[in-house]
């Protein structure tokens, strides 16, 4: 066993829970923050052209790019959490099969999606709303980011997820952070130095594609150099079993669906706010960017928690599994409270960073101070979804995702808008997240009570034969592998 493998085993089994969580979560949080800065910087650089058609052309590609993220989530979250559970159950050979399958699944999906996009570029862009003025800009950007960049993007996100789920969070976080920093550096270089005026959107696309290729190459070399017993590129060990494939997609699909519904919620909010005034739309648009900071930190914390919870669940170490959730939940609540305090105090300054118009600043300040109150409940709803993903409970995670966005958040937007207008739209996030967090907690409590009362770990569909004992109970697996 190599030094990295021993270190991973120490993190999963021996290291104190707060220290283990920090080792897993801090690199992930840093990479999340760098990607947040990159996304803002990309928008900033394209906006510097003062060409609305160029800005619109780049924005049109977002739904296509989100498909790449969804595919990466299927392979990364579905495969990654399954690998962590298999390692906890001491099934390293099955974990190897899932690891290689996840990587090649991401590569083939990326190639397939890139070819489809290239073939059907014009009808796809027109379907998304491209006009004669924006089509060429959108085509240039999509060619670089999707046709050239889809495969390395999906593969990079998948490999970083897999690395984190075998305990190598530092390497995964460094790779994603490196890609974001390279992109931030290359954007102005290609947009304003190397390419002539009028080609800025092409420069942004080249910078994004190149940074993703570099990140993917780095991750490939890292996995080969580490010689990890689980992560490899050979398919000679065979395919995962039917049960493991069911778990792969059972957890991966809900993880992929979440970002789509998240974006749908934002679209509905924008449309409803636009009906009130352009200033209100501008204000909420800025708020949605500013509020991403604690959200991305919370997601990074959840992603760091998942491998620890998954491993100890299958290892039969329920006390440590519960301690991981408690530590992550406590840290997330503390960060949320700090974020609320900072945003309440400095809301006007934060809005002025993006715009100087007094009316927009005033409205944006109000909206930010209202929406940030939901931070704690939003984090709690996120952490329970990730927790059920870690346990292989894909159906429960899917139920919570659908309930959150389709059954509660989006209907609440329409209701609060009708009752209280644009300020009702701002308050809807808090109202919805209180309901979602309470529902998530009830389902979590029910699942834990069933485990302790029956002595059976509810692993139906998790694709893993569990080992060990839980608090004196014998573990049984309801899924026949």
What are these regions (language model features)?
Residues 1-25, 83-149, 196-253, 309-374, ...:
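Short alpha-helical transmembrane segments in multi-pass integral membrane proteins
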Residues 13-44, 48-49, 63-78, 82, ...:
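N-terminal transmembrane alpha-helices
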Residues 23-42, 144, 179, 211-215, ...:
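Transmembrane helical elements of multi-pass membrane transporters/channels
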Residues 37-55, 125-132, 189-199, 260-293, ...:
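Helix-terminus/linker motif at the lipid-water interface of multi-pass membrane proteins
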Residues 46-66, 132-139, 201-203, 243-251, ...:
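Interfacial/gating helices of multi-pass transporter permease domains
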Residues 55-115, 153-167, 171-172, 283-341, ...:
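Small-residue-rich hydrophobic transmembrane alpha-helices
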Residues 67-70, 114, 183-188, 216-220, ...:
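Hydrophobic transmembrane alpha-helices of multi-pass small-molecule transporters
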Residues 76, 145-164, 172-180, 204-219, ...:
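Short runs within selected transmembrane alpha-helices of multi-pass transporters and secretion channels
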């Amino acid at each position: 066993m190599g030094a990295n493998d021993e270190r991973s085993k120490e993190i999963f089994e021996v290291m104190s829970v707060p220290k283990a969580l920090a080792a897993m979560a801090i690199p992930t949080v840093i990479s999340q923050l760098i990607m947040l800065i990159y996304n803002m910087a990309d928008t900033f650089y394209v906006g510097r052209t003062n060409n609305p058609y160029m800005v619109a052309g780049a924005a049109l590609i977002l739904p296509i790019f989100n498909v790449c993220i969804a595919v990466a989530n299927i392979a990364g979250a579905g495969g990654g959490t399954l690998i962590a559970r298999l390692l906890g159950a001491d099934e390293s050979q099955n974990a190897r099969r899932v690891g290689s399958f996840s990587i090649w699944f991401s590569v083939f999906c990326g190639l397939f999606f890139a070819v489809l996009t290239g073939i059907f570029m014009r009808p796809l862009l027109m379907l998304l709303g491209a006009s004669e003025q924006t089509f060429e800009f959108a085509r240039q950007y999509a060619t670089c980011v999707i046709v050239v960049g889809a495969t390395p993007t999906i593969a990079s996100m998948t490999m970083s997820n897999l690395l984190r789920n075998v305990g190598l969070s530092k390497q995964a976080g460094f790779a994603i952070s490196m890609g974001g920093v390279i992109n931030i550096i290359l954007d102005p270089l290609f947009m304003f130095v190397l390419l002539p005026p009028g080609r800025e959107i092409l420069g942004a696309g080249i910078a994004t594609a190149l940074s993703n290729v570099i990140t993917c190459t780095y991750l490939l070399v890292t996995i080969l150099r580490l010689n990890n017993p689980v992560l490899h590129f050979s398919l000679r060990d065979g395919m995962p079993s039917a049960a493991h494939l069911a778990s792969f997609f059972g957890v991966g699909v809900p993880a992929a669906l979440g970002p789509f519904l998240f974006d749908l919620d934002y679209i509905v909010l924008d449309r409803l706010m636009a009906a009130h005034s352009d200033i209100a739309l501008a204000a909420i648009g800025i708020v949605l960017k500013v509020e991403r900071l604690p959200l991305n930190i919370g997601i990074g914390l959840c992603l760091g928690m998942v491998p620890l919870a998954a491993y100890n669940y299958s290892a039969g170490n329920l006390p440590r599994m519960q301690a991981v959730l408690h530590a992550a939940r406590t840290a997330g609540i503390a960060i949320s409270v700090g974020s609320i305090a900072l945003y309440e105090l400095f809301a006007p300054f934060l809005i002025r960073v993006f715009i100087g118009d007094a009316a927009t600043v005033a409205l944006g300040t109000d909206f930010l101070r209202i929406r940030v109150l939901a931070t704690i409940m939003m984090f709690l709803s996120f952490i329970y979804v990730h927790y059920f993903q870690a346990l292989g409970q894909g159906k429960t995670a899917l139920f919570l995702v659908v309930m959150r966005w389709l059954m509660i958040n989006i209907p609440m937007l329409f209701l609060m808008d009708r009752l209280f207008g644009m300020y009702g739209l701002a308050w809807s996030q808090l109202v919805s997240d209180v309901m979602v967090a309470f529902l998530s907690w009830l389902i979590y409590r029910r699942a834990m009570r069933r485990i302790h009362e029956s002595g059976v770990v509810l692993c139906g569909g998790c694709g893993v034969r569990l080992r060990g004992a839980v608090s004196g109970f014998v573990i049984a697996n309801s899924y026949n592998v």
